[in-house]
Amino acid sequence: MNTVDWTPETLVADIEDLVTLPEVALRIASMVDDPTSSAAAIGREICNDAALTARLLRVANSPAFGQDGKIATVSRAITVLGVRQVRDLTVGITAIRTFDGIANELVTMESFWRQSVLCALAAGHIAARRQGGRNESPFVAGLLHDIGQLVLFNRAPELARQALLMSIYAADEPGLYRCEREVMGFDHGIVGVRLAQKWGLPRVLQECIQFHHEPSEAKEYPIEVATIHMADTVAVLAEIGSTDLRDGPAISPMALRALKLDHATLAEIVLQTQESAEGMLPLLTGAPMAVPALAAVQVL
């Protein structure tokens, strides 16, 4: 296909055979939405996939969920975390597995998922401190927020590279999503939400994926989208080892107002994110996770 013919819909349709969400995740998502399905039946469905079960239990027992080895079975995970949280973790884990075999020339899967995991952890910490909103799967929303980038990297690598280089070298630092719009007419958020819709992901995840760069555009879940928007900046700071907010992407004033978190609290969340990051990526992907040590806390 000629590059000028790409649209978010054709990109997702073109890659669908390569990144179809595994049947186990689709079945579990359907069962969670079915009022006649029991927690026990959902647990049995998960247990049919031994690799998924093992990874789910490792993640559920991680510091990110505060269980400290207390969850020994899938049924216990459902009881403690709830069926929707377990469903969303299942989607996140299987999505990582799905994309692991997808080639691209612009970024390694390890670096992509490392940044995504940092965003997921930051989102959880922000959700625990913010005022308002529902605790709608902040971890998984953070994990999947940039999934549209992987579609672009794989299906339209030349256009994605052009946008990436523009974002790096532009004097006014416009941000990758704006450069994607200039090059392609759309950004990775809309590509990601088209994939999320194909997968039947919950509406809250769709909004977080689509609007995480522009939280003021969120319709149904503005607090949750603002959380992922802010977590994106916290993840960058955790990655580079800084608590100075000037070192990361600017946080929307709307998000700061909506979440009611000051700069000192955000600096603490950067530290929390770093502390909880080590060991999380291996749980999800098997790859090691290393983040730089932070210098002295520097708060605006």
Q: Model-predicted segments: where are they?
A:
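Conserved alpha-helical "signature site"
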Residues: 1-164, 168, 172-253, 293-294
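Terminal helices and disordered tails flanking the catalytic cores of nucleotide-processing hydrolases
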Residues: 1-10, 253-300
